[in-house]
């Protein structure tokens, strides 16, 4: 187990912080992809410019 000198102000070790960051970024990319698909589908259905 890591000692307290390896912890940042969040209480996570560097490895834990990197893992959390990768999971967060995966979720962000998934959210952005769903948002883009939803906007494209809405634009195809009912264009808002034109």
From Swiss-Prot:
InterPro entries documented for this protein: Antenna_a/b (IPR000066), Antenna_beta_CS (IPR023623), Antenna_beta_dom_sf (IPR023624), LHB-1/5 (IPR002362), Light-harvesting_complex (IPR035889)
Binding site for a bacteriochlorophyll: 21, 39
Cytoplasmic side: 2-22
Membrane topology term: Single-pass type II membrane protein
Tree of life domain: Bacteria
Keywords for this protein: Antenna complex, Bacteriochlorophyll, Cell inner membrane, Cell membrane, Chlorophyll, Chromophore, Light-harvesting polypeptide, Magnesium, Membrane, Metal-binding, Transmembrane, Transmembrane helix
Disulfide bond annotation, renumbered to this chain: none
Compartment(s): Cell inner membrane
Biological process per Gene Ontology, one example term: photosynthesis, light reaction
GO molecular function, one term: electron transporter, transferring electrons within the cyclic electron transport pathway of photosynthesis activity
Keyword Repressor: no
Transmembrane segments: 23-45
Record Pfam families: LHC
GO-annotated cellular components: plasma membrane; plasma membrane light-harvesting complex
Positions in the Periplasmic compartment: 46-50
Function noted in UniProt: Antenna complexes are light-harvesting systems, which transfer the excitation energy to the reaction centers.
Subunit organization: The core complex is formed by different alpha and beta chains, binding bacteriochlorophyll molecules, and arranged most probably in tetrameric structures disposed around the reaction center. The non-pigmented gamma chains may constitute additional components.
Family of the protein in this entry: Belongs to the antenna complex beta subunit family.
The protein's name in its UniProt record: Light-harvesting protein B-870 beta chain
Native species: Roseobacter denitrificans (strain ATCC 33942 / OCh 114) (Erythrobacter sp. (strain OCh 114))
């Amino acid at each position: 187990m890591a000692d307290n000198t390896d912890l940042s102000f969040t209480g996570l070790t560097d490895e834990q912080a990197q893992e959390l960051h990768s999971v967060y970024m995966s979720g962000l990319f998934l959210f952005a992809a769903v948002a883009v698909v939803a906007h494209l589908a809405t634009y195809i259905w009912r264009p808002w410019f034109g």
